[in-house]
């Protein structure tokens, strides 16, 4: 019998949980309300050990637990009680004829499959943690939400006790619980299917791009808005992935915005493109400045900021090492939206916290590799993340097209400029000197304009500097622009039908020119 709002009293509960958190309190509350509890294995033992009345499921089924616990609840006397739609008189009559009672509440959580995989367990141990009976019970109860409520998370137990006091769950509440239950099962199944695909049955030769692709995310936070105030937005995290910015700890400041996250992600990745101590300053997903230093992180930040102080105002800063007090003192004099680092030296956070609004994050080092997803109309593009690990990213594999071989200092700057170029939106030209960008031309629809922009931003600092281009020069004009401004050495992928003309222009200008054979477009 249910009320006008579909509230159905709870008389009988089936409980089978791996995670015993809150179990005893839940069982005590159910028992005190007169609810009959049927349970399985270790769950039943935990309840019984506290003196709470509980019926073992094998007593209900008349069939023992077998096959090392693989079969406990896969029985008609269980699933008929889960699936009977009590709105239908014929279902109620069938239960009565069979001597089966319905369950109004099912509390189940599943074997820890993902945690077992993450622990490095053997294949057999992982397979053993693929739950069968649990998902079957959850799906059955969720399907039958007009008659039963299902709870899969210990955080929901307080809601069960509240519903008991109110006379049961309403239909609307059972619908919500059913939705959560199916989400839980879907996430679990995706984890199992993905692991099976990658570990037991990889496809060849395109194992990285299988016929089926599944992934699940959980909402971490609601954001004030998206890129613009009229766009709603939220942050989601992948619970199975290496911890990243979505899991970063915020130590100080206002809540992160959508744009804060996109810029912080670009800055974080740019800083870790370099092995030396590095600081990247990002605005609208493009670098205002990137610099490395063998002296200190404060020195790297100073050099990065000097590249374009005007654009760095309101920027996002990332460091690939601990932020020192000295760097924090400098940052505190500049309007900065976000700073993210693997850690902060004693006293550095106190200095940064003088600024009420600066967002201070600490995050784990980004994991190399992985895939990038980009939605398009009607589908999704997936590609391997662009890492600086191509054959041509190693300067030992570069080809000297013209000019004298670069001396060690010049070659070091060329390597830095080449690696910094990956973080710049195409078409990209980076001019660098002394381990720092001095002029960045980004996001232009032709390469000569990118060169002009980089030269304009670099000013007098361009003379004697080096430059990198993320893709080949399609015409000599881009290289000629750099040479005319005083650039002495350039590195680019090569591969244009006009490579010979570009090389001739470099030779004529006395510019050393290297070819990498690798490209780093970023759109």
Curated annotation (Swiss-Prot):
Keywords: Hydrolase, Multifunctional enzyme, Purine biosynthesis, Transferase. Disulfide bonds: none annotated. This is Bifunctional purine biosynthesis protein PurH. Belongs to the PurH family. It comes from Mycobacterium tuberculosis (strain ATCC 25618 / H37Rv). Pathway: Purine metabolism; IMP biosynthesis via de novo pathway; 5-formamido-1-(5-phospho-D-ribosyl)imidazole-4-carboxamide from 5-amino-1-(5-phospho-D-ribosyl)imidazole-4-carboxamide (10-formyl THF route): step 1/1; Purine metabolism; IMP biosynthesis via de novo pathway; IMP from 5-formamido-1-(5-phospho-D-ribosyl)imidazole-4-carboxamide: step 1/1. Pfam families: AICARFT_IMPCHas, MGS. It comes from the Bacteria. Coiled coil: none annotated. The keyword Ribonucleoprotein does not apply. One of its GO terms (cellular component) is plasma membrane. It catalyses: (6R)-10-formyltetrahydrofolate + 5-amino-1-(5-phospho-beta-D-ribosyl)imidazole-4-carboxamide = 5-formamido-1-(5-phospho-D-ribosyl)imidazole-4-carboxamide + (6S)-5,6,7,8-tetrahydrofolate; IMP + H2O = 5-formamido-1-(5-phospho-D-ribosyl)imidazole-4-carboxamide. Its EC number is 2.1.2.3, 3.5.4.10. The IMP cyclohydrolase activity resides in the N-terminal region. The gene is purH. InterPro entries: AICAR_Tfase_dup_dom_sf, Cytidine_deaminase-like, MGS-like_dom, MGS-like_dom_sf, PurH-like. NCBIfam families: PRK00881.1 (NF002049), purH (TIGR00355). The keyword Hydrolase applies. HAMAP family: PurH (MF_00139). Gene3D superfamilies: 3.40.140.20, Methylglyoxal synthase-like domain (3.40.50.1380). Residues 1-152 form the MGS-like domain. One of its GO terms (biological process) is 'de novo' IMP biosynthetic process. SMART domains: AICARFT_IMPCHas, MGS. One of its GO terms (molecular function) is phosphoribosylaminoimidazolecarboxamide formyltransferase activity. PROSITE patterns: MGS.
